[in-house]
Amino acid sequence: MTSPDLPEQPASDLPADAVILDVREPDEWAAGHIEAAVHIPIGQVTARLADIPQADPIYVICRGGGRSSRVSEFLSAQGIEAVNVAGGMQDWAASGRPMVSDTGRAPEVI
């Protein structure tokens, strides 16, 4: 569940030049991710705040939208313009948007 004030955008509607922060766990990332995304697992976001790209906005994604919603709320509280990617990587993959894998297999969302 997201805050009514938290901006959301469906994965299928993200602009081609969107700056994306993927907050999934390393095994999820390895199985399939957006090539240009920055990967910082949710448990490391606070400690790695300085590693988050400067972008207005930054789009935050996870598997289905729950973890990314929490991170988006946190980033917004830090003064960072964050947009939650509604539906997450599941919707990204379902809409046919490109993904890459670090496993040597076809990319997938796990």
Feature annotation, model-predicted:
Residues 61:
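Short, surface-exposed ligand- or partner-binding patches at beta-edge/loop junctions that are enriched
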